[in-house]
Amino acid sequence: ADTIVAVELDTYPNTDIGDPSYPHIGIDIKSVRSKKTAKWNMQNGKVGTAHIIYNSVGKRLSAVVSYPNGDSATVSYDVDLDNVLPEWVRVGLSASTGLYKETNTILSWSFTSKLKSNSTHETNALHFMFNQFSKDQKDLILQGDATTGTDGNLELTRVSSNGSPQGNSVGRALFYAPVHIWESSAVVASFDATFTFLIKSPDSHPADGIAFFISNIDSSIPSGSTGRLLGLFPDAN
């Protein structure tokens, strides 16, 4: 199975797999059962921003999800990613719908990682920024139902021609270049990621959510991972 570390924006409470009974943000280490969660007032039809940071000195992965009205949720978890992830990874965004549905629209996405080496005193950095997504976005690997170009956005899950979200859909977008996320001789390894999103649903219960994830470089969508598995995990263990 793939090795996945993710920050989930989970719109639907699947209490049978340990979710709290409300929409939440969570940190997932190799399992959809979050290590840590925080209550999130998801605003249907409003653009929100997610900001994720990590550095190897504090060994803490943190995320803040906020809306223009100042409403925000924060979650953090202490983890040494050297012990969890391979040295080279890919970063991506994933989303799913199930019985209930929502649009999982990404309007922008940026990422920066830095690796400061002891031996050479050099800093290796990787940076990308998408302020919009074109039809033929060559530097993204699209998986499942993900498409780009509609209004300059990235649609992670299926949307009908009139803009209505579809159920039982899963899609992911990964940056094409592998990221050197850690190195044994590095003094500091750090990264931060930001994306803006729009979740819109005609249902009283939108589902299922969006995640920023880091994985082994050959990661693909596990079969049967629509709905509560967010396109990331093969099962709910």
UniProtKB/Swiss-Prot annotation:
Keyword Calcium: yes
Binding site for Mn(2+): E8, D10, D19, H24
Annotated binding of Ca(2+), by residue: D10, Y12, N14, D19
Entry keywords, A to Z: Calcium, Lectin, Manganese, Mannose-binding, Metal-binding
InterPro entries, per the entry: ConA-like_dom_sf (IPR013320), Lectin_LegA_CS (IPR000985), Lectin_legB_Mn/Ca_BS (IPR019825), Legume_lectin_dom (IPR001220), Leguminous_Lectin (IPR050258)
Posttranslational modification: Concanavalin A-like lectins of the Diocleinae subtribe undergo proteolytic processing referred to as circular permutation. The propeptide is split into an N-terminal and a C-terminal part, the gamma and beta chain, respectively. These are then religated in beta-gamma order to form the mature alpha chain. The beta and gamma chains can often be detected in cell extracts. Residues 1-118 of the mature chain, as displayed here, probably constitute the beta chain in the propeptide, residues 119-237 the gamma chain.
Gene3D superfamilies: 2.60.120.200
Any one Pfam family match given in the protein's UniProt record, by short name: Lectin_legB
Family affiliation: Belongs to the leguminous lectin family.
General remark: Binds one manganese (or another transition metal) ion and one calcium ion. The metal ions are essential for the saccharide-binding and cell-agglutinating activities.
Protein name: Concanavalin-A
Biological source species: Canavalia cathartica
